[in-house]
Amino acid sequence: MSKFQQILNSFSIKETLNPKVWENPDNPKKATMVPKVRKALERIAEEFVDYLGDNVFVEDVVLTGSLSNFNWSEFSDFDLHVIVDMDEYGDEDELYKELFNLKKQLFNTNHNIKIFGYDVELYAQDAEEPHISSGVYSIMNNGWINVPRKTNLEIDKKVLEDKIKNWTEKIDTAVENGDIKVLESIKDKLKKYRQSGLDDGGELSYENLVFKYLRRSGNIEKLFDSVNKGTDKELSVERKIED
């Protein structure tokens, strides 16, 4: 099986929640997190909060994404969100959002934490930001905020494949040409493309599935690396030293 087909097949809906993560995985309303997993996520969240700094107003710690839903696969990771009451920072809330976002990136880059082979990704989320995922589980309260629902939505893999190839070609061409403005434009368009899909169709929208494919295949990393290299080149100064 090709890598392309392997990733496409990973988008299929499973019959149960992931049994490594959940007790009673075949009944989402009664499903609870495996104690060993919950304890590990609690420890990781505590480490992340300490890294964010003093005076972090934590309201909850939640698991969201495919491992709290029926669309989990070998490519899944633990999306662990620390819910922060940003209103507590008053007029400095935007400053703290930027700070937490930067620290989130550094934390995830500098750590390689896995549970049962799945990566753990940390986020600091504003309490006012709505939960997009249909499956959201409170680690602190050990219960569902949003109970996951198995969907009967059929994914037209030919349509998805065409959309993926279109974006892959865009990225490959832009990376090959190395035009920083084009690269940044594609990066921004891709972000908006995914968000529009999440807003209109949720996690199983074609836009979000395209984004997931591009991330799992390494295309997004390639795009971001090219943007960074292009920026470095623009900011660098080359000077010929005359004898």
Language-model segment annotations:
Residues 10-76, 84-243:
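Catalytic core of pol beta-like nucleotidyltransferases
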Residues 1-11:
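Short linear clamp-binding motif
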